[in-house]
A protein has these predicted regions:
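Helix-loop segments that flank and shape redox-cofactor active sites
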Residues: 7-14, 28-54, 118-132
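A generic "alpha-helical surface" signal
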Residues: 17-20, 24, 50, 57, ...
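Charged, amphipathic alpha-helical segments and their flanking helix caps
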Residues: 46, 53-64, 123-141, 146-150
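Residue-level signal for pocket-adjacent positions within structured domains
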Residues: 2, 35, 40-46, 76-79, ...
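A structural signal for well-ordered alpha-helices, especially hydrophobic packing surfaces
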Residues: 23, 30, 37, 56, ...
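Acidic/histidine-rich alpha-helical segments that form the ligand environment
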Residues: 64, 68, 85-139
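Disorder-to-helix initiation segments
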Residues: 1-22, 99, 103
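Conserved alpha-helical segments that form or flank metal/cofactor-binding pockets of metalloenzymes
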Residues: 44-83
Length: 156
């Protein structure tokens, strides 16, 4: 059924593409965080194990919300690992073996997503006239800012 929510039809596909690329980024970050949750070792094991668990649970909620936002705009959400890896702007990590490197990698990814989201917020509002997506992305950015702050504080 046709989506008629006040966003020009020509803007729906680019918005969905923006959201699907973000979905891929978030899924890669989710997987990396889950990996670190499973494989962290050392004297801070319990603390970091729980920290990573909270982070991947928050990312899981964000992933679902992003996919649903794309559906609200009348488009399908990408849903395969192959698709995610083809369009993500983040990199996988299977090499980090110490907790400090894990935290630095996660901090880098959260800060990368904050910058991407700042751009996407402006683009969705100004270019595509979609205040709903812009507001949605602002909420995601705030979550990444909070997580980045927690990680920076832990590393300080």
């Amino acid at each position: 059924m046709k989506v008629d929510i006040g966003i020009p039809k020509a803007h729906l596909q680019p918005l969905a593409t923006m959201l699907n690329t973000l979905l891929a980024d978030e899924y890669v970050l989710y997987t990396k965080t889950r990996n670190y949750h499973w494989n962290v070792t050392g004297s801070s094991f319990m603390e970091l194990h729980k920290l990573f668990e909270g982070q991947y649970e928050a990312l899981d909620e964000a992933i679902d919300a992003i996919a649903e936002r794309s559906r609200k705009l009348g488009h399908y959400a990408v849903g395969s690992l192959k698709q995610y890896l083809a369009i993500t702007r983040l990199t996988e990590d299977d090499k980090a073996t110490n907790s400090k490197q894990m935290l630095l990698n996660l901090l880098h990814d959260h800060e990368t997503l904050i910058k991407i989201l700042r751009n996407d917020i402006a683009t969705s509002a100004d270019k595509y006239k979609d205040a709903g997506t812009s507001d949605f992305l602002t909420g995601l950015m705030k979550e990444h800012e909070m997580t980045a702050w927690f990680i920076r504080s832990y590393l300080s």
